[in-house]
Structures are given as structure tokens and as C-alpha cells.
């Protein structure tokens, strides 16, 4: 049981490291889909990677990265909503 927890922790830390060094979430999720068998562990990894990836867009500090991300994924303009980057959903208020 301890070995399974250690492997899970190492997988999670590895995926977080990959997602924080410039890889897009879709690339890291693809690695999870390819190498982790279906089940609770896979679902937990995917949810954890998604949460970490949503915090990596630099909102509201780096607004241009949010736009770049949305243009890359959905070909829409990106807008910072607090710490979240939302594609094609403009703010109803001005941040700066």
C-alpha cells in the first residue's frame, strides 16, 4: 500500500513539474491518458493537473499569456477573471 502511494505521489509531482515548465495542459493530460490506466488514480491525476494548469496563466499579472492561451486552444480572445483565464467571456469591469 505504501508503494502505491509513493508511486501516485511521484506521478502527481512529475505531472505538476511538467505542466509548470511550459507544457500545455493538453500535453500533460495526453501523457496521463497514455501511461496511467483507467480508474480513480487517473481521475485524480487529471483533476489535479487541471487545477494546477488553471493557476499557471498568470492572471491578472500577465494578461497577454491568457490571450495567447485562448488563441492557441479556441481561437478566441482570453480575459482574466481574478486568477482564472476565461476564453471569449469578457469582463464586465475594467481591471486596470
From Swiss-Prot:
Tissue: Expressed by the venom gland.
Ranges for domain BetaSPN-type CS-alpha/beta: 56-93
Pfam families: Scorpion_toxin_alpha-beta (PF14866)
Propeptide: 22-29
Disulphide-bonded residues: 59-80, 66-85, 70-87
Family to which the UniProt record says this protein belongs: Belongs to the long chain scorpion toxin family. Class 1 subfamily.
Protein name: Neurotoxin beta-KTx7
Signal peptide feature range: 1-21
GO MF annotations, alphabetized: potassium channel regulator activity; toxin activity
Location within or outside the cell: Secreted
CC per GO annotation: extracellular region
Amino acid at each position: 500500500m505504501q508503494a502505491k502511494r509513493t508511486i501516485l505521489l511521484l506521478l502527481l509531482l512529475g505531472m505538476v513539474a511538467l505542466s509548470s515548465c511550459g507544457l500545455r495542459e493538453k500535453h500533460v493530460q495526453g501523457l496521463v491518458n497514455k501511461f496511467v490506466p483507467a480508474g480513480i488514480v487517473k481521475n485524480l491525476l487529471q483533476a489535479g493537473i487541471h487545477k494546477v494548469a488553471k493557476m499557471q496563466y498568470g492572471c491578472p499579472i500577465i494578461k497577454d499569456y491568457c490571450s495567447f492561451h485562448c488563441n492557441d486552444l479556441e481561437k478566441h480572445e482570453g480575459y482574466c477573471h481574478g486568477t482564472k483565464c476565461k476564453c471569449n467571456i469578457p469582463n464586465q469591469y475594467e481591471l486596470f
